[in-house]
Structure formats: structure tokens, C-alpha cells
UniProtKB/Swiss-Prot annotation:
This is Ubiquinone biosynthesis O-methyltransferase. S-adenosyl-L-methionine binds at residues 44, 64, 85, 129. Belongs to the methyltransferase superfamily. UbiG/COQ3 family. It comes from Escherichia coli O81 (strain ED1a). Pathway: Cofactor biosynthesis; ubiquinone biosynthesis. GO terms for biological process: methylation. InterPro entries: SAM-dependent_MTases_sf, UbiG_MeTrfase.
Length: 240
């Protein structure tokens, strides 16, 4: 069977991977294309650590880890972290930065479905941040994340809602007006309504625990978590 068409490798959009490969060398540039990820990372990390009851000593999987911004920060909290991504260049950048920082993270180039086939039920925490909107079959990713976490373990998702406001904010505003991210980063058709994500979660062993919005204020140039999931949102689930 062709590897690209096998059940564990089907869920790859090579055009999406190419977008991030092209800018991978600037992943850790605090003023570059990934500046927004660096800015929101403390909020994401804080939310994950608080909702999971801390990360120290836990086995954590970061799905769609890219250049390792979140993965490294979770390792700094004392977690044993594995980072998954299908982009070769982002993983090379992640490995080099971890080496330079003296941080231990195990980076692996494979799909989450492939990883789930080999490591089911092995993680205390699974994170999947800003990744679902970049794959052909996001429901398959949700299913695999559920398979990977231990009973009672925590799974976190973050993505973008699909509506007019999110198109204005995340595409028109962020890409074309404020130029916070490169043009073409997002495709509003791939955004995911909270009800859709919760529907996929309900078809797994996961149970919704909490949902919050991630909000950007262009006047103060700051981010915060809070009610309202019209644009960016995060979901905490727990394995039954």
C-alpha cells in the first residue's frame, strides 16, 4: 500500500506543511511571523497547566508542535514531552533550539494517527494547538488524541471558529491589515465551529470539561483568555 494513502498517513495536507516549511527558520524570531504564537504561549501554557493540575512529572504529547514553542515551555515545567509534526524543517528548528536551550524534548516526524497506533493510552496530557484547521480530516485527529491519553488524562484543543467575525479578525485583520501572520496562513472554510468540535469529542471517550475564548485587543496589543468563543477558542477535555 502506498504510504501516503495508508490509514495512518492519509491526514496530511502537503500545501499546509509547505507554508510552515518556508518560514521555519524564523520560528523562534520573537518579532517574526510567529510573534503571535510567542505572545499567546504564556496564556496557553497557563491554561493547560492549571486545568491539568500541573505538568511536573507528567508524560505530555504536543500534536502539531511546529518549531517547539509550546513543547519547550511544557518541558520547562517539568513534563516529559514528545512533539509530533509532519514538517521536517520545523522539527529541525525545534531540535536545534531545544539543544541550544538545554531542554529535553523528543521530536518525532509522524502523524498523530500513526503515533496512536503505536502508543495508545501512554500520555497524561495531549495538546493539539492551532492544528485542526490545517489538516484534511480534523475529526481523525480528535479520535487519535483520545486514543493516546490515559484514562483520566487531559486533552486540549485550540482552533478558530467559523463565522463572519472570525474571517474578519483572523484573516482580513491578522493577515492583511495588521500583518500579524503571513497572508494565506488561514482558510476560513477550514475553521471549526465549537459545536462541530464538541460533536467529534462526543464520539470518543473524551468528555468536555471547559471552554474559553482567546481574545486580541488591537488597541492595547494584548491577548487574554475569557468568555466568548467567536474567534479563537480553547477546549479542555478529559478521558473517561
Amino acid at each position: 500500500m502506498n504510504a501516503e494513502k495508508s490509514p495512518v498517513n492519509h491526514n496530511v495536507d502537503h500545501k499546509e506543511i509547505a507554508k510552515f516549511e518556508a518560514v521555519a527558520s524564523r520560528w523562534w524570531d520573537l518579532e517574526g511571523e510567529f510573534k503571535p504564537l510567542h505572545r499567546i504561549n504564556p496564556l496557553r501554557l497557563g491554561y493547560i497547566a492549571e486545568r491539568a493540575g500541573g505538568l511536573f512529572g507528567k508524560k505530555v504529547l504536543d500534536v502539531g508542535c511546529g518549531g517547539g514553542i509550546l513543547a519547550e515551555s511544557m518541558a520547562r515545567e517539568g513534563a516529559t514531552v514528545t512533539g509530533l509534526d509532519m514538517g521536517f524543517e520545523p522539527l529541525q528548528v525545534a531540535k536545534l533550539h531545544a539543544l541550544e536551550s538545554g531542554i529535553q524534548v523528543d521530536y518525532v516526524q509522524e502523524t498523530v494517527e500513526e503515533h496512536a497506533a503505536k502508543h495508545a493510552g501512554q500520555y497524561d496530557v495531549v495538546t493539539c494547538m492551532e492544528m485542526l484547521e490545517h489538516v484534511p480530516d480534523p475529526q481523525s485527529v480528535v479520535r487519535a488524541c483520545a486514543q493516546l491519553v490515559k484514562p483520566g488524562g487531559d486533552v486540549f484543543f485550540s482552533t478558530l471558529n467559523r463565522n463572519g467575525k472570525s474571517w474578519l479578525m483572523a484573516v482580513v485583520g491578522a493577515e492583511y491589515i495588521l500583518r500579524m501572520v503571513p497572508k494565506g496562513t488561514h482558510d476560513v472554510k477550514k475553521f471549526i465551529k465549537p459545536a462541530e468540535l464538541l460533536g467529534w469529542v462526543d464520539q470518543t471517550s473524551l468528555k468536555e470539561r471547559h471552554m474559553t475564548g482567546l481574545h486580541y485587543n488591537p488597541i492595547t496589543n494584548s491577548f487574554k483568555l475569557g468568555p466568548g468563543v467567536d474567534v479563537n477558542y480553547m477546549l479542555h477535555t478529559q478521558n473517561k
